[in-house]
Amino acid sequence: MLNMRKTHPLLKIINHSFIDLPAPSNISAWWNFGSLLGVCLIIQILTGLFLAMHYTSDTLTAFSSVAHICRDVNHGWLLRNLHANGASMFFMCLFLHVGRGIYYGSYLYKETWNIGVILLLTVMAMAFVGYVLPWGQMSFWGATVITNLLSAIPYIGTTLAEWIWGGFAVDKATLTRFFAFHFILPFIITPLAIVHLLFLHETGSNNPSGINPDSDKIPFHPYYTIKDALGFMLLLLILLLLALFSPDLLGDPDNFSPANPLNTPPHIKPEWYFLFAYAILRSIPNKLGGVLALLASILILLIIPLLHTANQRSMMFRPVSQTLFWILTANLITLTWIGGQPVEQPFIIIGQLASMLYFTLILVLMPFAGLFENYMLKPKW
């Protein structure tokens, strides 16, 4: 009976994934974000499910239904605030998780990495369609601007945009289908996350040193279960502080006004977690060029394993690469700031320089830094 977890067909899978899993003894707090993303996904599915019970995906009543949730539904305000700020926490954890993968060379587990990039794209799609649902001013105009980018595709663009809209502009049909997409995507993301974990467990976790840790492994439980539990508590603390004390801090004031197709906001921008990509999109004064740059800014992650030139896996002992990594981080923060600014000087030129630096760092400077570090480590006698 005591060893049922090792023999029962279902419990055996859980046991091999979360209890008796051999884990490197030296993984740091940067390895907490995978489990934190799992918690974020569960929070979002649960709060979203209860919100969907009261929401109506109709242009005439969508905005009112959200107001009704906040005013009349028991703890509806809390559900909405947790769901909206939970999305911000989700992306914060995602960016840190990807950053950790780049810093410590985890991208060399190619299958795990590629599924992770697909997951990132799917979560971004889910967040975009979800942002449209409250049918506020910025929801509507954000949807109009971003879906309109499809029309930049040669020959089929306009047809494709109208197919997505279900008409000649963003309207009732668009809102209804976006709600359907937003509801189904978490149930696509969950199995993808399980496959992501499956491939990770084929190789075992990477560790800060980047050296094969097989000679020094410890069981996942209790060591890393307690460590993850601490992460959960900190995540929930930050989420509750956001949701209870400043729920609208990361939102857009324009979304307090119902969508009005006849009145364009002076400055259309997405949520903060898309601003870096939005800045790259805007930095190119050509519609198709901007769309290609936007796609490249995310899809570039897929070729990072091919750009690894260093003899060492991790950046832990590579100061030149470390410096470039932190310049890249600062550059992404700059792009996020620029994405939220109006299209005028000096923001235009800063955005263009930051966009150019983003691609130069990843495609040119970091691979060269790896080769330079290899050369410096060679014995010179």
From Swiss-Prot:
Give me the comment on cofactor binding: Binds 2 heme b groups non-covalently.
Query: TM segments?
Result: 33-53, 77-98, 113-133, 178-198, 226-246, 288-308, 320-340, 347-367
Q: Where is the signal peptide?
A: none
Q: Which cofactor does it need?
A: heme b
For this record, the Gene Ontology CC terms, alphabetical, are: mitochondrial inner membrane; respiratory chain complex III
Q: Which GO terms describe its biological process?
A: mitochondrial electron transport, ubiquinol to cytochrome c
Sequence similarity: Belongs to the cytochrome b family.
The name under which this protein is listed is Cytochrome b
Species in which this protein is naturally found: Dasyurus geoffroii (Western quoll)
What's the encoding gene here?
MT-CYB
